A protein has these predicted regions:
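Middle-to-C-terminal accessory/interaction subdomains
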Residues: 1, 124-176, 180-354
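Residues that flank catalytic or metal-binding motifs in active/ligand-binding sites
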Residues: 2-4, 23, 54-56, 65-69, ...
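Internal "kinase-insert"/substrate-recognition segments embedded within catalytic cores
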Residues: 5-15, 22-30, 48-58, 62-168, ...
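Aromatic/His-enriched, Gly/Pro-containing loop or helix-boundary segments
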Residues: 26-36, 393-400
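A conserved alpha-helical element in kinase catalytic cores
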Residues: 31-51
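Short acidic-glycine loop/turn motifs at beta-strand connectors
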Residues: 62-64, 186-188, 419-421
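Glycan-association/targeting regions that enable binding to alpha-glucans and other polysaccharides
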Residues: 323-440
Length: 440
């Protein structure tokens, strides 16, 4: 084939050379995607909720000859890490088995390879100067000491990644055969999973070693894919980053809250369809002029809404996602969530003082306030009470209160409330987004 992907290092000859702050160009050849939309739209959605790559269209010319329309995807490298985590030299891995084994565990983060880190080399690609001991210690905690997991894992970002993968049926990922993700250990010592390789999202890739669909699954089955399949069912090979995390009822409710947010903000309101139309119009002439594309121009025109059949069936994006939204809305944890209303900051906003915060909440059994004083530090969590003893006014009036001790000049905070049915964040994109308060 003429239209191959490209991975170009701009600093290969001149160390430190870059273009607009980027020293690597990764060009995807838009294979497995007749719509030409999957990768760009997926990254745009993901960036609302977690660190994820930027992506756009590129017409690629080589020696003044047009090779075709590509997707230009920001590399997950040291520059990416610096921008999102404020550091770049900590332990950094790619979950990328040297040989993908459809009958094996791949980069599933299980401890099956044993206690010698050498046995993990075939499954994980070390991107930093060191880190095998850190990775093994994390895997050991994930599999054997789950009660300590929050000390080694950014749980919220993990839940967002899983929510994204299951909402958009992005199974060429940790979900399907445990690949195509990164792990970076930030300055807090927490591992952060990072999405990668989204060209087969929206059910372009329909393979998984979840036992319910061992031999693959249809578009109709993708629509009703259970987002807790690796918890509710049997995984042929372990998925501890899902199953062991989902053992917590609270994490399951948080996960479903994130799924709800992704679906309501992008799918239910049809914004993804409108964005698809915009991108389709932007790419139209370039797709028409791409003589090396893998699918026809008619396929490109149709696949936003309708199935295209080639080697496999590629669902239309709206065909898949509108029906998936209807299905997900029926699941436990999607409906029946608490209502979070009025926020009130009580008392003077003075550095070093204690700051009381109240929140009006309906239909909640538990309300949490998460706060921190600096970017990228870990959120501390306080339980809020409606007992008349925590600055909340009258007991039982649905106003919950808590006090943040010895505040700094900047407070970043968010809320989480849950009942037996469902959970709700405020703001809904927390912890990636949060409220900010300046003190005196």
């Amino acid at each position: 084939r003429l239209k191959n992907p490209f991975n170009i290092d701009l600093d290969y000859i001149i160390n430190g050379q870059d273009y607009q702050g980027y020293d690597k160009i990764k060009l995807s050849n838009v294979i497995q995607d007749p719509s030409f939309l999957r990768e760009i739209m997926s990254y745009e959605i993901a960036r609302k909720y977690m660190p994820a790559s930027k992506a756009n269209f590129v017409n690629l010319y080589i020696n003044d000859t047009l090779l075709g329309l590509y997707t230009n995807v920001e590399a997950v490298n040291k520059e990416f890490l610096s921008n999102h985590y404020g550091s770049r030299n900590n332990t950094f891995f790619k979950g990328n088995p040297a040989t993908l084994d459809l009958n094996g565990e791949n980069a599933n983060l299980s401890n099956s390879p044993g206690a010698d880190s050498v046995n993990y080399y075939p499954f994980y690609n070390l991107k930093s100067d060191f880190g095998w001991t850190d990775l093994y210690n994390f895997i050991d905690t994930l599999n054997n000491h789950v009660s300590s997991l929050e000390n080694q894992l950014n749980v919220d970002q993990t839940l967002w990644m899983h929510a994204f993968n299951y909402s958009l049926i992005n199974f060429d990922s940790y979900v399907g055969y445990a690949q195509n993700y990164y792990l970076y250990q930030d300055d807090n010592g927490l591992f952060n999973p990072i999405l990668w390789d989204l060209n087969m999202s929206f059910a372009s890739y329909r393979l998984t070693d979840d036992s319910d669909f061992w031999s693959g699954f249809s578009i109709a089955e993708a629509i009703v894919s259970d987002p807790l399949a690796h918890f509710n069912s049997v995984s042929v090979y372990p998925r501890p980053l899902m199953r062991n995390v989902f053992n917590s009822e609270r994490y399951r409710r948080m996960y479903m809250a994130h799924i709800r947010t992704i679906m309501e903000e992008n799918i239910v309101n049809a914004s993804y369809y409108n964005r698809g139309l915009e991108l389709q119009a932007l790419a139209d002439s370039s797709v028409m002029n791409d003589t090396n594309k893998f699918y026809s121009y008619t396929d490109f025109q149709n696949n936003l809404t309708n199935m295209v059949t080639d080697l496999i069936d590629y669902p239309g994006l709206t065909q898949l996602m509108d029906a998936r939204a209807v299905y997900l809305q029926t699941l436990p944890g999607y409906q029946g969530f608490p209502t979070l209303d009025t926020i009130d900051i009580v008392g003077p906003h003075i550095v070093g003082s204690n700051l009381a915060i109240t929140l009006k909440v309906a239909d909640a059994d538990t309300v949490l306030l998460a706060y921190r004083f600096a970017d990228r530090s870990v959120f501390e969590k306080l339980q809020m009470y409606d007992d008349g003893m925590h600055g909340d006014g009258i007991a039982g009036d649905s106003v919950y209160g808590a006090t943040i001790p010895e505040v700094a000049n900047t407070i970043q905070y968010y809320f989480y409330a849950e009942n037996d049915s469902a959970g709700k964040f405020a703001p809904v994109r927390a912890a990636y987004e949060y409220y900010t308060l300046k003190t005196q």
